[in-house]
């Protein structure tokens, strides 16, 4: 691991991208947002519309019920943003889509990642 990468990984200003904001991805996004992290969600259909209109709703025994305003985009929208601005590149990408949908987000990952991005 390079020194630059080590410094980035200890920095609290990491940008997190959650690709697939269903049960698993939504929980990860919610807990990261509650911890004050810079989180962006990738969703589609009704999930995307609900997150944009009402916010991300997190139900947790630990944190109770929370509604969080988190930026949400389609994969295509975010890929276009990331292609046009280095500021939109993610430091950490959580892939939380169903197995049969992984192929559909490879282009997003290519465009949203920089050379030191961690993909989980």
Predicted regions and their residues:
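Rossmann-like NAD(P)(H) cofactor-binding subdomain of soluble oxidoreductases
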Residues: 68-120
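Short, structurally constrained coil/turn elements
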Residues: 10-12, 66, 113
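Intrinsic-disorder/low-complexity coil detector
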Residues: 1-2, 70
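Conserved N-terminal Rossmann-fold NAD(P) cofactor-binding segment
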Residues: 38-90
């Amino acid at each position: 691991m390079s020194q630059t990468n080590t410094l980035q990984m200890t920095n609290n200003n990491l940008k997190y991208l959650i690709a697939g904001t269903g049960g698993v991805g939504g929980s990860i996004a919610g807990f990261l947002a509650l911890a004050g992290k810079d989180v962006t969600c990738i969703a589609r259909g009704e999930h995307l519309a609900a997150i944009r209109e009402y916010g991300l709703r997190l139900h947790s025994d630990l944190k109770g019920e929370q509604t969080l305003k988190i930026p949400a985009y389609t994969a295509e929208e975010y890929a276009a943003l990331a292609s046009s601005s280095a500021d939109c590149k993610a430091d950490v990408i959580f892939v939380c889509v169903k197995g049969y949908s992984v192929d559909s987000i490879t282009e997003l990952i290519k465009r949203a990642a920089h050379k030191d991005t961690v993909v989980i």
